[in-house]
């Protein structure tokens, strides 16, 4: 929060009575209010822009040499945990991509560790040159009946609004509870409103009629559009629409045609869930901007969507523009179409120069500490058996680069009254093992699309309850993979037919995040993908993040939880066998 002295100093700079800390000269300023390219010196004092005009003197002068000057980019909805690194490490990845602000929903770690998980994320982000605003998780667990680590009711969330970085209520995923007027979810919404916060939606699979329930209680954003029609339905209903491009949820190309000159002010960008390797090769919101431009959106419009629109969406009045009174979060662009970044300023400090981080800006004196809850289950190989009497079964149809699944009906092989995986038909066994309370709950189902020819993979990243999920060709291989991630305290493992671990990634923080530098995580993810390719013929997608979403019941169409097979259409557990 600013004080009187800082405001007085900024005013003195703006009217020429005092020198600026920094002046940027010879830049072409992207005016996100008017849609114009403008010229003028940019004077910065105490991390804020004091004025644009003629400012001949400063402690430091940067010659932009004709480059474009854009506001810092904003990711309007992201789960840091999907990158499998801590917030302070996440900042090191994002700043070279021009992202200076994120709005995050830490519901992954909250599902494992409750309020302590949220507090850890807030603490770890302190001191990093990145604004991390938090939307409090609304649906922990995502649906009734799941076994996650902690349950967060309104009374647990309310005290967290005191934190200056908490700005609202995150994606309301439990649509049925909204529709039936559940007191707990509506109290959470009321609390957010009373604190002046926004309320995010999660309208996966909802029709325009369903959206009335959302709008009626005050939900004002959505990031789950997978088609232009869905995006327009949400826009017409009065929502801000976040166009998503992540690792699995790749929806921007299918939704971008909804954006027009008249309505673009209601659209912004998000990544939602994106792995480190994709962030490093493609980028973050800068990639969304490029993709939008490649698909017909004017460059300045795309930049507006990534900056001022996102700030307006989340009611952040001092972010998203290069103008007097705004935070000096600035990106230097060599070209508006390619969005090639040369320099990034955060709060008026250069944090990226010539595309390279200035590491001194990213050093944290005290690293936040987190004690992970112990993985707590006792699994027998018999728990992985799937008894069947009917050869016609429901099968989870995994779709590459898509969060939705298909509800398939397939003829399966039964031997001695139990399901037997088929490599030829690509019908594999999938299991979800409850890991938080030693309930003994194990959901077993059938999945198609992973193309395994041997072995198994397992992970403790399993949205949103984050139990252990595994898929494999044999029970023995699945048991080995599950046992390995249990012994490491959480993580991802690939095993071969003999049960040998081909590669793993330990996730020491809640079984979700590594406490290592992102470079090590990137190397391990590459090793995991190489190991997966040794045991699978399926290519062109990320198998680990894809697997982690096959347990999320609030996204259509068929998912698996520790309670069994979950049908989104009926919002209930169904048998594996078709009648």
Swiss-Prot record:
Keywords: Hydrolase, Manganese
The protein, known as: Adenine deaminase
A Pfam family assignment: Adenine_deam_C
Keyword Cell membrane among UniProt keywords: no
Cofactor(s) this protein requires: Mn(2+)
Entries under HAMAP family matching the protein: Adenine_deamin (MF_01518)
Top-level taxon in the UniProt lineage: Bacteria
Family named by the database record: Belongs to the metallo-dependent hydrolases superfamily. Adenine deaminase family.
MF annotations from Gene Ontology: adenine deaminase activity
Enzyme Commission number, as recorded: 3.5.4.2
Any one GO BP annotation for this protein: adenine catabolic process
InterPro entries: Adenine_deam (IPR006679), Adenine_deam_C (IPR026912), Amidohydro-rel (IPR006680), Metal-dep_hydrolase_composite (IPR011059), Metal_Hydrolase (IPR032466)
Reactions mediated catalytically: adenine + H2O + H(+) = hypoxanthine + NH4(+)
């Amino acid at each position: 929060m600013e004080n009187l002295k800082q405001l007085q100093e900024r005013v003195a700079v703006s009217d020429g009575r005092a020198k600026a800390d920094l002046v940027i000269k010879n830049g072409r300023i992207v005016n996100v209010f008017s849609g114009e390219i403008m010229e003028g010196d940019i004077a910065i004092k105490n991390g804020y822009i004091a004025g644009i005009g003629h400012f001949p003197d400063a402690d430091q002068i940067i010659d932009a040499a004709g480059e474009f000057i854009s506001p810092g980019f904003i990711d309007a909805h992201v789960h840091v945990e999907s990158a499998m690194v801590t917030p302070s490490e996440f900042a090191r990845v994002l700043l070279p991509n021009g992202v200076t602000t994120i709005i995050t929903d830490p519901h992954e770690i909250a599902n494992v560790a409750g309020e302590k998980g949220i507090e850890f994320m807030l603490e770890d982000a302190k001191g990093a040159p990145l604004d991390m605003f938090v939307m409090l998780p609304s649906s922990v667990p995502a649906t009734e009946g799941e076994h996650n680590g902690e349950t967060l009711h309104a009374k647990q969330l309310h005290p967290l609004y005191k934190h200056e970085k908490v700005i609202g209520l995150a994606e309301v995923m439990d649509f049925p509870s909204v529709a039936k007027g559940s007191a707990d979810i509506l109290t959470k919404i009321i609390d957010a409103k009373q604190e002046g916060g926004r309320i995010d939606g999660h309208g996966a699979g909802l029709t325009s009629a369903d959206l009335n329930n959302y709008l009626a209680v005050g939900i004002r954003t959505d990031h789950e559009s997978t088609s232009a029609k869905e995006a327009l339905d949400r826009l017409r209903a009065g929502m801000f629409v976040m166009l998503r491009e992540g690792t699995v949820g790749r929806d921007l190309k299918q939704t971008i045609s909804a954006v027009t000159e008249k309505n673009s002010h209601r659209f912004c960008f998000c990544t939602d869930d994106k792995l480190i390797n994709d962030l490093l090769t493609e980028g973050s919101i800068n990639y969304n901007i490029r993709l939008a431009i490649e698909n017909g959106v004017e460059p300045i419009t795309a930049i507006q969507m990534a900056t001022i629109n996102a700030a307006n969406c989340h009611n952040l009045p001092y972010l998203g523009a290069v103008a007097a009174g705004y935070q000096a979060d600035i990106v230097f662009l060599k070209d508006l179409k390619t969005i090639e970044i040369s320099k990034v300023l955060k709060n008026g400090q250069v944090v990226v120069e010539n595309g390279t981080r200035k590491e001194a800006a990213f050093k944290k004196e005290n690293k936040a500490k987190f004690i992970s809850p112990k993985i707590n289950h006792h699994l027998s190989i018999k728990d992985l058996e799937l008894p069947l009497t009917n050869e016609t079964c429901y099968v989870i149809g995994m779709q590459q680069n898509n969060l939705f699944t298909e509800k398939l009906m397939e003829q399966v092989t039964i031997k001695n009254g139990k399901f037997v995986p088929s490599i030829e038909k690509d019908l594999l066994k999938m299991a979800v093992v409850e890991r938080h309370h030693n309930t003994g709950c194990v959901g077993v189902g059938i999945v198609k699309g992973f193309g395994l020819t041997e072995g198994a993979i397992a992970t403790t990243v399993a949205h949103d309850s984050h139990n252990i999920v595994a898929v494999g060709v044999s029970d023995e291989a699945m048991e080995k993979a599950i046992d390995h991630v249990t012994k490491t305290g959480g993580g991802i493992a690939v095993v071969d037919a003999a049960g040998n671990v081909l590669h793993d990634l330990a996730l020491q923080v809640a079984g979700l995040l590594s406490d290592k530098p992102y470079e090590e995580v990137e190397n391990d993810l590459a090793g995991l993908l190489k190991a997966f390719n040794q045991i699978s013929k399926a290519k062109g997608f990320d198998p680990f993040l894809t697997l982690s979403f096959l347990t999320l019941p609030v996204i259509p169409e068929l998912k698996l939880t520790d309670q069994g097979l979950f049908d989104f259409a009926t919002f209930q557990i169904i048998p594996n066998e078709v009648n």
